[in-house]
């Protein structure tokens, strides 16, 4: 039986908010085909802005992986993530044209602004490497699990949205998330009690921010 790590224990402990983030009503509406396409357009515009703020965060993760990890493979995993973000931004631009979303006119809503400030806080040199890697995994994993759900057997995902679902729900991205999780777990194994507490708090905060982001896409703030 595979050994369960610290992150799995935390997910069990905070199962309610984890489920709220990975099986949100917005995601479920995509899977069952009832999604309001205006909500999808809102999500598209807001997520494009988020990704542009996510890039410098991942760049900071790369620097920390080079300086603080002690494992050269960490840098390679994060570098792969940065490379994929360039393609992701181009994908958003194509989708924006397809859905008539002019990103230059999109204003970040409150949930997006709060998430952006959270990312900036994580970029502080005061934040410990295990905490950063836990947050990095959680941010990526929520999208992977959410959009993979939209591709599972029995889905009624609208054909025009399958591209978005495949972008984050594919097996390659799942493997990437697993690699990031392994890094986080390795770091957490030897972390102090204080750092473990900070990492758990950050994990929960990511999940809360993800729920708020989905809510925003459905018409909230």
Swiss-Prot record:
Kindly list the positions annotated as binding substrate: 47, 88, 140
Which Gene Ontology molecular-function terms are recorded? thiaminase activity
Check the record and name the InterPro entries matching this protein: Haem_Oase-like_multi-hlx (IPR016084), TenA_E (IPR026285), Thiaminase-2/PQQC (IPR004305), Thiamine_Salvage_TenA (IPR050967)
Q: Give yes or no: UniProt keyword Cytoplasm.
A: no
Disulphide connectivity of cysteines: 150-165
Origin superkingdom = Eukaryota
* UniProt entry keywords in alphabetical sequence: Disulfide bond, Hydrolase, Thiamine biosynthesis
The top EC class is hydrolase
Which EC number applies? 3.5.1.-, 3.5.99.2
Catalytic reaction equation(s): 4-amino-5-aminomethyl-2-methylpyrimidine + H2O = 4-amino-5-hydroxymethyl-2-methylpyrimidine + NH4(+); N-formyl-4-amino-5-aminomethyl-2-methylpyrimidine + H2O = 4-amino-5-aminomethyl-2-methylpyrimidine + formate
* Record-linked CDD domains: TenA_E_At3g16990-like
Q: What is the documented disruption phenotype for this protein? A: No visible phenotype.
The active-site annotation reads 210
Q: Name the pathway.
A: Cofactor biosynthesis; thiamine diphosphate biosynthesis
> Could you tell me in which tissues this protein is expressed?
Expressed in roots and shoots.
Choose any GO biological process term that the UniProt entry carries and state it.
Answer: thiamine diphosphate biosynthetic process
Q: Does the keyword Disulfide bond apply?
A: yes
Q: Which PANTHER family match?
A: BIFUNCTIONAL TENA-E PROTEIN, BIFUNCTIONAL TH2 PROTEIN
Q: Which family does it belong to?
A: Belongs to the thiaminase-2 family.
Q: Any idea what job this protein has?
A: Involved in thiamine salvage by hydrolyzing the thiamine breakdown product 4-amino-5-aminomethyl-2-methylpyrimidine (amino-HMP) to 4-amino-5-hydroxymethyl-2-methylpyrimidine (HMP). Has a high formylamino-HMP amidohydrolase activity. No activity with other thiamine degradation products such as thiamine mono- or diphosphate, oxothiamine, oxythiamine, thiamine disulfide, desthiothiamine or thiochrome as substrates. Does not display thiaminase II activity, as it is unable to hydrolyze thiamine.
What's the name of the protein?
Answer: Bifunctional TENA-E protein
> What gene name is given for the protein in this entry?
TENA_E
């Amino acid at each position: 039986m595979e050994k369960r790590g610290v992150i799995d224990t935390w997910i069990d402990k905070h199962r309610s908010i984890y489920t709220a983030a990975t099986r949100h009503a917005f995601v479920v509406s995509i899977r069952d085909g009832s999604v309001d396409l205006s909500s999808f357009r809102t999500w598209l515009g807001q997520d494009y802005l988020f990704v542009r703020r996510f890039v410098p965060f991942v760049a900071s993760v790369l620097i920390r992986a080079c300086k603080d990890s002690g494992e050269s493979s960490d840098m390679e995993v994060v570098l792969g993530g940065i490379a994929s973000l360039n393609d992701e931004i181009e994908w958003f631009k194509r989708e924006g044209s397809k859905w008539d979303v002019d990103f230059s006119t999109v204003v970040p809503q409150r949930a997006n602004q709060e998430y952006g400030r959270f990312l900036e806080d994580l970029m502080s040199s005061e934040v410990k490497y295990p905490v950063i890697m836990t947050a990095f995994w959680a941010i990526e994993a929520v999208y992977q699990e959410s959009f993979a759900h939209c591709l599972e057997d029995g889905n009624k995902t609208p054909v025009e949205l399958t591209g978005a679902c495949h972008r984050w729900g594919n097996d390659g991205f799942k493997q990437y998330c697993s690699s990031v999780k392994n890094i986080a777990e390795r770091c957490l194994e030897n972390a102090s009690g204080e750092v473990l507490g900070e990492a758990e708090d950050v994990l929960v905060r990511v999940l809360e921010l993800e729920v708020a982001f989905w809510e925003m896409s459905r018409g909230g703030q």
